[in-house]
Amino acid sequence: SAGHIIGSAQIYLEYKGEVVIISGDYKRRKDATCAPFEVKKCHTFITEATFGLPIFTHPEDKQEAKKIIKSMENNKEYCHLIGVYALGKCQRLITILRELGFNDIIYLHGALMKISEYYKERKINLGIIKNISELRTNEYAGKLILCPPSSLSDRWSQKFRNVIKGFVSGWMSIKQRVKQKNIELPIVISDHADWNE
């Protein structure tokens, strides 16, 4: 396993006693949604380098997820609209929030539902998740709603009033990206290895 997302894998090649491993996307951090990264002895390791610079030292995942919970506690009249990638990041964020004791219903954009149901079928505990279409506009206050990042700035998101927009990505450690995307609640959680990993 590469520990990146569910089903991720490394490529292991052996020829005449020489072993080469090609990591593909990977991370070394604990993740309840996928098998952990497998360390294998090799002569050559070909790594991804999405965050392969010293400036990318990601904070602890649970500390970042706590920012969402704290913001919700401090801003009960607002809905929290959080951008997450549909495969992996959505489900990982949900499991981290559940581990932190957040047991409220988490509402999902329709584009996130099918993949999340797949994770649930694989016995990954996401708690209660529902499609956002089950809520009326006047019921958004105080709710946590996850959506694809592109939805944060398209017509779909215009129906939300009193909203705090967040985005969960390793790229949220770059202040210019946060500003460009008009994100109020940047959450630095990545499915890729950082510099120290």
Predicted segments, located by residue:
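Hard-cation-handling environments
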Residues: 65-78, 84-142, 146-147
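Short, solvent-exposed amphipathic alpha-helical segments in soluble enzyme
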Residues: 37-39, 96-101, 123-124, 159-163, ...
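Active-site metal-binding loops of divalent metal-dependent hydrolases
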Residues: 5, 24-26, 49-51, 87, ...
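A short secondary-structure junction signal
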Residues: 32-34, 56-59, 92-96, 118-119, ...
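Core dinuclear metal-dependent hydrolase active-site scaffold
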Residues: 1-34, 75, 130-161, 165, ...
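His/Asp/Glu-rich metal-coordinating catalytic cores
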Residues: 1-88, 99-100
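Hydrophobic/aromatic beta-strand patches that form the interior of the parallel beta-sheet core
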Residues: 21, 43-46, 107, 146, ...
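Short, flexible loop segments at boundaries between secondary-structure elements
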Residues: 109-121, 171-173, 178-188, 194
